[in-house]
């Protein structure tokens, strides 16, 4: 026989209070290398700003051609590793920049150089070559991810949870509209 479906409970989660000031936490330990993490708030998955933050994180720290790697590792030799990624999903997320300082580099020296890279990104329009390169990488990563049945099923479930399973077919258009 048929099993009747149950009622779907309303998902009501409180939003985190708005952060209005800069916060930092310094932890000192005896470790092989000094690590840093910068976290910036970003919109939830349903917001177009989510996709802009995703592209920005790729421009900043996806690979060896990224802005942070080129400037802070290759040119200035301030870090031994650096990257950027996002944590967003249903709720507001974070764009995180993290890595490890080279020996002898102070956090203040690194911080100044990092903010110079971020200010340049903020104040200058990204050229078409860089944007095209990022879009190709995003499309390629998505196509490889979609080859596996489990990944396709998980992505479909994610979009259904967001309220529109067809969003899986429309997401690439959002990226290309940036």
Regions found by a protein language model. Give the residues of each.
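M16 family metallopeptidases and their MPP-like homologs
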Residues: 34-44, 70-177
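Short C-terminal domain-edge/linker segments immediately following a structured domain
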Residues: 10-17, 57-58, 66-72, 90, ...
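Short, charged, low-complexity patches
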Residues: 49-53, 57, 65, 107-111, ...
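Active/ligand-binding-proximal structured segments within catalytic/core domains
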Residues: 38, 47-60, 69-72
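Short, glycine/acidic-rich beta->alpha junctions
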Residues: 64, 178
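An aromatic/glycine/proline-enriched structural segment found at the starts
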Residues: 1-44, 145-146
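Bilobed periplasmic-binding protein/Venus flytrap-like ligand-binding cleft at the lobe interface
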Residues: 1, 53-63, 113-121
């Amino acid at each position: 026989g048929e099993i009747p479906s149950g009622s779907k409970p309303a998902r009501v989660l409180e939003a985190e209070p708005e952060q209005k000031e800069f916060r930092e936490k310094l932890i000192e330990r005896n470790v092989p290398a000094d690590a840093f993490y910068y976290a910036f708030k970003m919109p939830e998955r349903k917001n177009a700003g989510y996709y802009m933050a995703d592209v920005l994180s790729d421009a900043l720290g996806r690979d060896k051609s990224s802005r942070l790697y080129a400037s802070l590792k290759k040119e200035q030799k301030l870090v031994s590793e650096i990257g950027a990624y996002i944590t967003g999903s249903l709720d507001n997320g974070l764009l995180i920049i993290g890595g490890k300082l080279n020996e002898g580099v102070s956090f203040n020296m690194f911080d100044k150089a990092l903010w110079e890279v971020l200010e340049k990104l903020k104040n200058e329009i990204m050229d078409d070559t860089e944007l095209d390169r990022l879009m190709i990488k995003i499309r390629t990563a998505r196509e490889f991810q979609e080859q596996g049945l489990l990944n396709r099923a998980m992505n479909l479930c994610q979009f259904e949870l967001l309220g529109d399973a067809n969003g899986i077919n429309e997401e690439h258009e959002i990226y290309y509209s940036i």
